[in-house]
């Protein structure tokens, strides 16, 4: 089709729209209500799109204008509702907003501005296939259309602009034919826009409605080649005014949307951070709870072990029985019954007789047979008691039987109680009929006291044996029954511990010991008669009361064994005596003993022994120390005071306050010092009296008799006629002949039956052979010798347990073997180390502790004599580590065959009866081995040094130089080198030779340290084979160094040389490593 076709197309389109253009006011009125022209415009555009294939490029131009008009009208709806290409459309919209904000301002300033076409707005994307390409085209159209209005401002008319646009068809992109679905979609979108505009018109003013209708008509007129410039300008102005608010609202919505998304993103990030923090806190809290749970579990385990060690651990069955007994006791107390065992330990009360006779008189046989209850004389309580106690009759059958057996023997005493009770009951009933229950209970207590007093005066035939039967099962402590306190003597070697005991018991044990040094634990029991006789000198006025049955004193060889006994958890020692030599003051083992006593919180007194060593001291045998001191000369008293103050100062340095016992006003804060002399016995009565006073007054709770058994094995000995026996310390409880006992053995737990219980004669040492006293049962505290089967392999120092009726032997066996397992845990698992053999567990632990401090591994341990099998086991070290092929044997016999085998195999056996001698012998052997190692490694071990040449006396074969030691130590046989830097930066090492001899001040020396030689040292070097001329290859200005290597550094780390290398020398080695390039 040619121009004619094109014109006819335009004519038809203008005819269709002519009425609207001519009657614009009428159209605006109609569009305020409805806009049917949009539907007609859509139909026209569809027909035009079908016929556009046959038109020229100019006609395509007209179709494009029409399409742009439709797209412009639907811009906002597509931005909000169409999900395709949000990012590209957003960018285009922002560009459009800037243009629309700019163009209306120009329209207001120019009175006759050119018509701005709707094509100035960017084209919307018509299909999702090419969003990027369409965006680019849109941006290109924007640039072109932004340029054309500027030309219109220079005087050109709107119609000429339209014609110029029509005359440039190549610049307009070709528009494709829309499908039916696309047309329907556009139609729907226009319908949505129309409804949206209607809603906006209802809210706006009449002027805004007019502007909105003008916009619609202007959009239609823009696509039509209008001829009236004034109408076109009016439409353009209306369109510009309408577009501004809509685009601003859209931009505002987009900003709100963007702000909302950013806020949501921030909230999500904050929630994620909070969640992560909560998770971390939860993990921390969980870890804390887990740690607390583990600590609690460990605490419960330790508490359980401690209770087991003390014999206080109860099985489930025992706990149930105890709870049942407690409930029954509570029921009795609530019913008004009073238990004798809980009456503050009033031993004088005899409630068993009162209850029995009163209940017989009132017809209540159940109370009379119970033997442990005391009821009120009040009638109301007597009536209630049968109902309460009838429930317990079946549980008290045994006690009833025992009491009935004694009724005949107690008839006379019962009659006395009957008369006394009848006399007291009549006024009681008459006076207290209206008294409250509290008054009755008070009267019951007062009656019981009166009854006890009368019973003591009138009835002296009462049997004391009934008292233990009256004690309830719940109470295992009798407050009026104190056992013998256990006292331990500690102190440094040769301070006079055993000699002090010899003075107490009038014995001479110390002289019979090997080297005069105690090697084993010994126990001596002092009966109260002996104590009274000993303290008679200081108790002339009779102020000191004796409430304990005796005193058990344990003599220890040192802190090691005492630690071993304390580690078992037994309360073996109640009070301790720390012996200090007044001439020497505090010594190393004394300080160790103080630390041990402080850790165990054991109270102690200090015996300042050997006061008779003071020059000029006049001894008075077995005298009180205050009396003896007052009879000495003034000079001796001054020296005594000086030495005491010096020891007090040393104790203060250890954190202890101390004072002489007769000047001590605060026993709780100050340690008492008792001057003594083991030779003359002076001060010994003061010491014993102080021990008795402290234990009775300040420690009565700790020495109460407890039925729970606590027993520790001290020694294992073979006695002629008795066989293998064990010496034990019975701290608490009772041992009976025939008891089933469990103790620790080298081959496993030992379960046997007691055949005999023996004790030494009073004031006799348990270690000394003497006649023994046989016992059917022994009460704590006492040193006891037990005869039983299978005791040969018993471990000295371990606990002893008695199998009760409700105990399981296997459980006790596992518990008792824990002591040995803890000891075996110290053995080196690598299998390389020395073999240790000892007589007791305590001495074995002392040896192991010493070897641990010396950092010497232990491969095997054993208790008892040394046999061939022990030597064979030790001989395996000859292949692994020859220096550890030795045995340390303390206080044990070595079999003759074992000695011969050890000599053949090359195993060294160290045996000693004094543990300190064994330490010395082993230390000397170690030094000898180290010296051999040093000699063997002397060529390899090179000590670091830096030398400065002072003078050259001989420059070749041999080189003799005068040098000064700048750093380190110069020794004989040290290789000396000079180091020069090559042009490439690498060090060049020039060997001069080894040091053959050293002279300082014309005297030969083996080594010279830094700063030791003021005028220098003459050093002779033996040539290493290379012909070096001092002065040619090496000059006096060159520094000289000892030639160290990686092998020499490793040899210095060996124990043979490690102690000889100082910290400064190690720093010098680090510097020389960099110089010689050693890695």
From Swiss-Prot:
Record's compositionally biased regions (Low complexity): 160-169, 321-334, 361-376
Region (G1): 491-498
Main location: cytoplasm
PROSITE patterns, A to Z: G_TR_2
Cofactor: a monovalent cation
GO BP terms in the entry: cytoplasmic translational initiation; translational initiation
Record-linked InterPro entries: EFTU-type, P-loop_NTPase, Small_GTP-bd, T_Tr_GTP-bd_dom, TIF_IF2, TIF_IF2_dom3, TIF_IF2_dom3_sf, Transl_B-barrel_sf
Subcellular location: Cytoplasm
Cofactor, how bound (note): Binds 1 monovalent cation per monomer in the active site. Structural cofactor that stabilizes the GTP-bound 'on' state. May also act as a transition state stabilizer of the hydrolysis reaction.
Annotated region (G5), positions in chain: 677-679
Residue numbers spanned by region G4: 609-612
Basic and acidic residues compositional bias, start-end: 173-192, 253-293, 385-408, 436-466
Protein role: Plays a role in translation initiation. Translational GTPase that catalyzes the joining of the 40S and 60S subunits to form the 80S initiation complex with the initiator methionine-tRNA in the P-site base paired to the start codon. GTP binding and hydrolysis induces conformational changes in the enzyme that renders it active for productive interactions with the ribosome. The release of the enzyme after formation of the initiation complex is a prerequisite to form elongation-competent ribosomes.
Record protein name field: Eukaryotic translation initiation factor 5B
Species: Schizosaccharomyces pombe (strain 972 / ATCC 24843)
């Amino acid at each position: 089709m040619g121009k004619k076709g094109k014109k006819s197309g335009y004519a038809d389109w203008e005819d269709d729209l002519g009425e609207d253009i001519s009657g614009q006011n009428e159209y605006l009125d109609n569009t305020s209500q409805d806009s049917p022209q949009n539907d007609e415009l859509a139909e026209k555009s569809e027909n035009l799109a079908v016929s556009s294939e046959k038109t020229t490029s100019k006609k395509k131009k007209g179709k494009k204008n029409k399409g742009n008009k439709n797209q412009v009208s639907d811009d906002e709806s597509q931005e909000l509702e169409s999900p395709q290409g949000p990012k590209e459309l957003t960018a285009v919209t922002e560009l459009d907003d800037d243009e629309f904000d700019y163009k209306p301002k120009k329209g207001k300033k120019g009175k006759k501005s050119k018509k701005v076409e709707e094509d100035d707005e960017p084209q919307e994307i018509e299909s999702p296939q090419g969003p990027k390409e369409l965006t680019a085209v849109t941006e290109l159209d924007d640039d072109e259309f932004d340029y054309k209005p500027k030309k219109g401002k220079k005087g050109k008319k709107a119609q000429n602009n339209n014609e110029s646009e029509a005359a440039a068809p190549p610049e307009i992109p070709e528009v494709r034919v829309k499908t039916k679905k696309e047309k329907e979609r556009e139609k729907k979108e226009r319908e949505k826009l129309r409804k949206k505009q209607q809603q906006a018109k209802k809210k706006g003013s009449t002027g805004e409605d007019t502007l909105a209708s003008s916009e619609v008509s202007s959009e239609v007129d823009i696509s039509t080649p209008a001829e009236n410039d004034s109408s076109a300008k009016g439409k353009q102005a209306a369109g510009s005014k309408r577009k501004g608010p809509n685009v601003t609202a859209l931009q505002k919505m987009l900003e709100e949307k963007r702000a909302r998304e950013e806020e949501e993103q921030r909230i999500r990030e904050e929630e994620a951070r909070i969640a992560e923090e909560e998770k971390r806190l939860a993990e921390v809290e969980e870890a804390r709870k887990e740690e607390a749970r583990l600590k609690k579990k460990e605490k419960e385990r330790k508490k359980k072990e401690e209770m087991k060690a003390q014999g206080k651990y109860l099985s489930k069955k025992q706990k149930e029985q105890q709870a049942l007994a407690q409930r029954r006791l509570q029921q009795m107390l609530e019913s008004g019954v009073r238990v004798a065992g809980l009456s503050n330990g009033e031993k004088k009360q005899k409630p068993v007789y009162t209850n029995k006779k009163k209940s017989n008189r009132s017809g209540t046989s159940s109370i009379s047979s119970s033997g442990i209850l005391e009821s009120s004389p009040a009638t109301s309580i007597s009536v209630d008691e049968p109902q309460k106690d009838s429930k317990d009759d079946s549980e008290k059958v045994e006690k009833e039987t025992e009491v009935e057996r004694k009724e005949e023997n107690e008839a006379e005493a019962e009659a006395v109680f009957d008369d006394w009770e009848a006399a007291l009951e009549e006024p009681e009933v008459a006076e207290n009929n209206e008294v409250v229950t509290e008054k009755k209970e008070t009267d019951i207590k007062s009656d019981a006291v009166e009854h006890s007093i009368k019973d003591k005066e009138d009835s002296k035939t009462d049997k004391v044996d009934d008292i233990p039967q009256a004690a309830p099962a719940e109470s295992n402590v009798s407050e009026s029954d104190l056992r013998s306190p256990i006292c331990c003597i500690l102190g440094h070697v040769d301070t006079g511990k055993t000699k002090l005991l010899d003075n107490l018991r009038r014995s001479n044990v110390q002289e019979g010991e090997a080297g005069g040094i105690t090697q084993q634990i010994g126990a001596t029991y002092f009966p109260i008669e002996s104590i009274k006789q000993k303290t008679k000198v200081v108790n002339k006025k009779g102020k000191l009361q004796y409430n304990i049955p005796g005193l058990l004193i344990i003599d220890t060889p040192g802190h090691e064994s005492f630690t071993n006994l304390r580690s078992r958890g037994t309360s073996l020692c109640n009070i301790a005596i720390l012996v200090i030599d007044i001439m020497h003051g505090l010594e190393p083992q004394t300080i160790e003993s103080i630390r041990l006593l402080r850790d165990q919180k054991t109270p102690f007194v200090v015996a300042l022994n050997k006061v008779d060593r003071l020059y000029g001291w006049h001894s008075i045998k077995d005298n009180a120390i205050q009396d003896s001191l007052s009879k000495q000369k003034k000079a001796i008293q001054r020296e005594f005071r000086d030495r005491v103050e010096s020891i007090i100062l040393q104790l203060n340095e250890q954190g202890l306050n101390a004072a002489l016992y007769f000047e001590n006003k605060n026993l709780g804060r100050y340690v008492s010092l008792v001057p003594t002399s083991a030779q003359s016995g002076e001060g010994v009565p003061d010491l014993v009296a102080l021990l008795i006073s402290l234990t009775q007054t300040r420690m009565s709770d700790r020495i109460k008799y407890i039925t729970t058994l606590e027993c520790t094995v001290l020694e294992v000995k073979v006695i002629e006629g008795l066989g293998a026996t064990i010496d034990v310390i019975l701290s608490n409880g009772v041992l009976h002949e025939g008891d089933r006992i469990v103790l620790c053995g080298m081959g496993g737990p030992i379960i046997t039956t007691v055949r005999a219980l023996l004790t030494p004669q009073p004031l006799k040492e348990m270690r000394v052979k003497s006649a023994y006293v046989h016992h059917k049962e022994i009460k704590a505290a006492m040193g006891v010798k037990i005869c039983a089967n299978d005791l040969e392999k018993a471990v000295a120092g371990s606990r002893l347990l008695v199998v009760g009726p409700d105990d399981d032997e296997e459980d006790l066996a596992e518990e008792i073997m824990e002591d040995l397992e803890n000891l075996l845990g110290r053995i080196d698992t690598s299998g390389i180390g020395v073999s240790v053999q000892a007589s007791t567990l305590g001495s074995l632990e002392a040896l192991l502790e010493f070897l641990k401090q010396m950092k010497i591994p232990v491969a095997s341990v054993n208790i008892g004599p040394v046999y061939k099998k022990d030597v064979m086991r030790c001989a395996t070290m000859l292949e692994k580590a020859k220096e550890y092929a030795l045995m340390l044997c303390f206080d044990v016999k070595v079999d003759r065959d074992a000695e011969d085998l050890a000599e053949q195999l090359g195993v060294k056996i160290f045996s000693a009866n004094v543990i300190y001698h064994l330490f010395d012998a082993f230390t000397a052997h170690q030094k000898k081995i180290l010296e051999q190692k040093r000699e063997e490694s002397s060529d390899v071990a090179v000590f670091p040094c830096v030398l400065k040449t002072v003078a050259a006396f001989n420059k070749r074969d041999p080189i003799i130089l005068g040098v000064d030691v700048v750093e380190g130590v110069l020794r004989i046989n040290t290789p000396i080198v000079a180091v020069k830097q090559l042009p490439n930066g690498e060090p060049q090492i020039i060997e001069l030779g080894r040091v053959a001899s050293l002279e300082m001040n014309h005297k030969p020396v083996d080594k010279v340290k830094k700063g030791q030689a003021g005028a220098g040292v003459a050093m002779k070097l033996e040539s290493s084979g290379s012909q070096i001329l001092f002065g040619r290859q090496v000059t006096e200005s060159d520094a000289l160094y000892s030639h160290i290597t990686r092998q020499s550094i490793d040899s210095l780390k060996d124990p043979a040389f490690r102690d000889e290398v100082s910290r400064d020398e190690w720093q010098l080695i680090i510097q020389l490593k960099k110089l010689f390039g050693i890695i």
